[in-house]
Amino acid sequence: MAPPQHLCGSHLVDALYLVCGDRGFFYNPKGIVEQCCHRPCDIFDLQSYCN
């Protein structure tokens, strides 16, 4: 598994598409940017935004 990373902008959206796949995701910019851009996040953090 990959170590936690800072993901911002298009990198964050690409990671969500990769993790969530066909389920899609809900995009709450304030929450996910705070969690994954300002601080490093891991795959489990990203999965919490999947539908």
Curated annotation (Swiss-Prot):
GO biological process: glucose metabolic process
Subcellular location: Secreted
GO cellular component, one term: extracellular space
GO MF, any single term: hormone activity
The keyword Disulfide bond belongs to this UniProt entry's keyword annotation: yes
Cystine crosslinks: C8-C37, C20-C50, C36-C41
Oligomeric form and interacting partners: Heterodimer of a B chain and an A chain linked by two disulfide bonds.
Name under which the protein is recorded: Insulin-1
Lineage per the UniProt record: Eukaryota, Metazoa, Chordata, Craniata, Vertebrata
Originating gene: ins1
